[in-house]
Swiss-Prot record:
Keywords on record: ATP synthesis, ATP-binding, CF(0), Chloroplast, Hydrogen ion transport, Ion transport, Membrane, Nucleotide-binding, Plastid, Thylakoid, Transmembrane, Transmembrane helix, Transport
Subcellular location: Plastid, Chloroplast thylakoid membrane
Membership in a protein family: Belongs to the ATPase B chain family.
GO cellular component, one term: chloroplast thylakoid membrane
Additional observations: In plastids the F-type ATPase is also known as CF(1)CF(0).
Protein name per Swiss-Prot or TrEMBL: ATP synthase subunit b, chloroplastic
Keyword flag Lipid metabolism: no
């Protein structure tokens, strides 16, 4: 108390005329009282806030851990799906190759069968043409024989031939 001017009244009691020091002391006393009572409440609020923040951090960590786990699971499922898709593609390629080979083999068999059928058809047509030619030759020969027979055939020879044919016909019917 540098500039302290006090007047002593009645020996023990003093009156302090320095207002600044008194105000500072009064302010310190008020602050001590306020901090004592309000400080407990403020410490409680700060402790609650601290606990709330810690709880939020724990929950955030837990959610982050769960998100990481879900991400790992999703990545694992993606890898499995990609592996399955690759396997399906490989199986499809194998199936395509097998179908291709089967188609080529079937086509070759069809070509061979068509070649055989063509050969058989040609043989059949050739035989048919030969048979028609043979039939025409036989008809022509028979016609020429008839003409010669008709020219040289007398009625007695004609009767003998007819009788002979009748006997052959009856013999063939009897047997």
């Amino acid at each position: 108390m540098l500039l302290s001017t006090s007047f002593l009244l009645a020996g023990h009691f003093g009156f302090n005329t320095n207002l600044l020091e008194t105000n500072v002391l009064n302010l310190a006393v008020v602050l001590a009282i306020v901090l004592t009572y309000v400080g407990d409440a403020l410490r409680g609020l700060l402790a609650n806030r601290k606990q709330s923040i810690l709880t939020n951090f724990r929950e955030a960590d837990q959610r982050a851990t769960e998100a990481q786990n879900k991400l790992r699971e999703a990545q694992l499922e993606l890898e499995q799906a990609q592996a399955k898709a690759q396997k399906i593609r490989e199986q499809a390629n194998v199936t395509i190759e097998q179908e291709k080979k089967q188609f080529i083999r079937q086509t070759q068999e069809d070509i061979k069968r068509l070649g055989t059928l063509q050969q058989e058809t040609l043989k059949f047509e050739q035989q048919k043409a030969q048979n028609e030619l043979a039939e025409k030759l036989v008809k022509l020969a028979l016609q020429q024989v008839r003409e010669k027979l008709n020219q040289r055939l007398t009625s007695s020879i004609h009767s003998a031939v007819n009788n002979f044919q009748i006997v052959l016909f009856t013999n063939s019917k009897a047997s």
